[in-house]
Amino acid sequence: MTSRLVALLRREDGFGPVETAIAVTAVILLIPLMIAFGRMAKANTSVDAAAFMAARAASISRTGGEAQGAADAVAAAQLAQDGVSCANRSVSVDTSGFGTEPGQTALVAVSVTCRAELGDLPVPGMPSTKAFTGQYTSVIDTYRGRS
């Protein structure tokens, strides 16, 4: 009698649907997580590209004020082109290089920060926004006039 009971308890009939249900549930939970990681990677890359483009635009400006405006506009356009939605975006430009005399090497540094929105993804524990920062430094033309 005991051996028959042990054999009955060891049977694996009917475990296929249970295993499938567990596997499908795990996959369904992993898909939004993979999408979230993909979005974060895209946002990080886009913010870095925006910082690069903004620094380049600032470095070809004639004045520090123009550099700030150009960097902000280019960063916003680059992020919009890449489809990155920022809850809060800031562009910081170090324009101290515009104070140097022509003939001396001067730099302009740009930092772009974007709080990318992630709240529409159904991932438990995922913050609704995540901050990404990109920084880039570009050389101002050495022999061009500055003000």
Task: List each model region and its residues.
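Alpha-helical assembly-interface signal, strongest on the long, hydrophobic N-terminal helix that forms
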Residues: 1-73
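Short, conserved structural patches
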Residues: 2-3, 60, 64-147
